Amino acid sequence: MTNADEGGFGGQTAKGELPRHEATDPRGQMHRKKRSMPDADTREFLRAQNVAHVGTVDAKGWPYVVPLIYVYEGNDYLYLHTGNHHGHFLQNIQRNPRVCVEVGAMGPVHRGHPFACNSALVFTSVIAFGPVRIITDRDKKSWFFDQVLAKYGEPSWTFEPGYPLLDRIILYEQRIEMVTGKHSEGLYH
């Protein structure tokens, strides 16, 4: 990933990075380009956060967003899972696999003067677009849960080996086509 004007996810560039967006595709266009995050910072932020808000669209055109845990290792794939084999998320994905993933973190609000509307929020956000597919391979599902436990669990936890309930979960792999990272230092930018 690079600054929005230089490319990022969606096909290899000369630098080995993935283009962020095509100039004609509004998904990756950022209004305030000075807040655009460099490639390495965007990847690290996406890897380090804990909750992804995943947006789909239902059959009637209504947006549907769910918070999910996820694994991202710095490449062009993001892994998510649900345990529901009959829910809205799965129905929406089966009809239209294109999703938008948002990962964000808020910092403090800087008080503005002389009016409240002059205040500004410190924040970081990453938005990733791309299709998802369902992964049925048990080895990949086991890998995912190993990664989840490493990311979210406590190092002192011990378990019996194996994952006997793998068939109860649905593992999704998002192929990231476009991504943008944005950071604001509030009033200190």
List the predicted regions and their residue ranges.
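A short mixed-secondary-structure module that forms the rim of ligand-binding clefts
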Residues: V71-V109
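A generic structural signal for nonpolar/aromatic side chains embedded in well-ordered alpha-helices
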Residues: L46, N92-I93, V148
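An N-terminal domain-cap segment
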Residues: D25-N75
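A sequence-level detector of short linear motifs
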Residues: V65, Y79-L80, I134
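Anion-coordinating catalytic cores for phosphoryl-, nucleotidyl-, and glycosidic chemistry
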Residues: Q12, K34, R43, L90-Q91, ...
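A generic structural signal for short beta-strands and their flanking turns/coil linkers
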Residues: N50, V66, G74-D76, R95-E102, ...
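Short, structured patches in soluble enzyme cores that scaffold and shape functional sites
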Residues: T56-D58, T82, V103-A105, I176-M178
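Charged, gly/pro-rich active-site loop segments
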Residues: T2-K34, M106-H189
